[in-house]
Amino acid sequence: MHNSPIKTVVIVGGGTSGWMTAAALSTVLRGQYSIRLVESDEIGIIGVGEATIPMIQRFNKVVGIDENEFLRETQGTFKLGIEFVNWGKLGDRYMHGFGRIGQDLWTVPFEQYWRKMRALGKAQDLESYCITRMASKANKFMQPPSDVTNSPLNDIAYAYHFDASLYAKFLSKIAIQRGVVRTEGRIVQVTQREGDGYVDAVVLASGERIEGDLFIDCSGMRGLLIEETLKTGYEDWSHWLPCNRALAVPCESAATLTPYTRSTAHRAGWQWRIPLQHRIGNGHVYCSSRISDDEATATLLANLDGKPLADPRMFKFTVGMRNKAWNRNVIAVGLAGGFLEPLESTSIHLVQAAVSQLIDFFPDQGFSSADIDEYNRMSRFHFERIRDFIILHYHQNQRTDSDFWKDCAHMAVPESLVEKMKLFRSRGRIVRFDNELFAEVAWLQVMQGQNLQTQGYNPLVDLQSEEDTVEYLESVRNVIAKCVEVMPEHSAYVASHCAAAKMGM
């Protein structure tokens, strides 16, 4: 009996997490399983402007989503990276651009040659050698061309900005077309099997009982199944990431449609800016023990590009993760599994990663403990590596204008991050742990942008003469500059490929 296949999958909660899960499972399971999604119209979803990372392209391709249609339906724009303002110190500005920087030479990473020449005053800023950073600076965008080879244009890596609630709506249509049954209703009771405590049904206010074999908890931070029912426990990381509230508000669009997200550090947190076709999504993530809600609201509203289109909405959170993402026959996806502030636009990716792992470890009714343990190990690894990357932004700062930033600079950080920073300080080397999300080039840009100083460079760089290295760097810079010149404006590219219908608020 234990090897019998799963018959019914019940997804508790809609929103982006629920409908991403439903769309992916209905595609991969090909109608061989019953999939039900339960959501209540009484419960609002956190539908703000959402920024993503390039991995989302893989998800959309698996589901079979046409890119231009998706962007039209979600008021979406393209994203080449994230600009960070005032993060190292007041007045600092740098970008984490997607994709490659320069071109490696022999077995030595490009940035090692750059580092030597930069110290000698013979190299430009790092951004000059990254096509996505230079294109962002010029507000240019194009997709990698299929008819051009051996060009920096092939290295254009990109993601998207879109309206999260519209994305959920878009995915719901796909999932329902592929057999997912949506049930509207408020869950008032969760029942468990005697003996092992597995969830066997959810009961709605209407009295309807919905049974299932596998339950996916997409109920948000409350964790209706994973926490309120199974008491899984939550690991609090607020001693490393003390921000615990966010205010979100849309505003009128600016004149220029920028192809990047912006993060501006404030006195006790930071503000996001996400450009959509019809508006700009804004939010202020802050620490409530260092700034009042009224002050945080005033800071947010004082730093908008245009007129606010709604009243700010507040969200309270504790950064951290569940002790287990998979407990018995319940898998937590999205905010039900944990929360990391969206500084590096990882919220959607964490949903994608959870769904991908679920597909890799899809169970039968035996619910293998080995599979569950490995799923939980992978989930923890994924969360912890992203956690470290976010902590780096806070910890490696030189700001002295507030106790918040001074405390972040002096706090103890995870040993895994200590080792990464120590290695970089030595000779600028970066080691990527196993399959962690962020590649070496991402760590490089943030470490460099946050002014983490190195004591040297790879000695193999000295095998090439300074003259040849300068010539090589200059050739890379010139080719990238010429490529950016031929790229269209981001706004023009959106208008010609994926312009959405005009819509009001």
Label every model-predicted segment:
Residues 7-33:
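N-terminal Rossmann-like FAD-binding beta1-loop-alpha1 element of flavoenzymes
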Residues 26-48:
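Glycine-rich FAD pyrophosphate-binding loop
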Residues 48-136:
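Dinucleotide-binding Rossmann-like beta1-alpha1 core, especially the glycine-rich loop
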Residues 95-189:
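Conserved N-terminal helical subregion
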Residues 149-296, 355:
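Predominantly flavin-linked oxidoreductase catalytic cores and closely associated redox partners
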Residues 266-317, 336-350, 361-365:
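Conserved FAD/dinucleotide-binding core of flavoprotein oxidoreductases
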Residues 320-385:
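Conserved mid-domain beta->alpha element of the FAD-binding
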Residues 360-505:
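Long, low-complexity C-terminal extensions of enzymes
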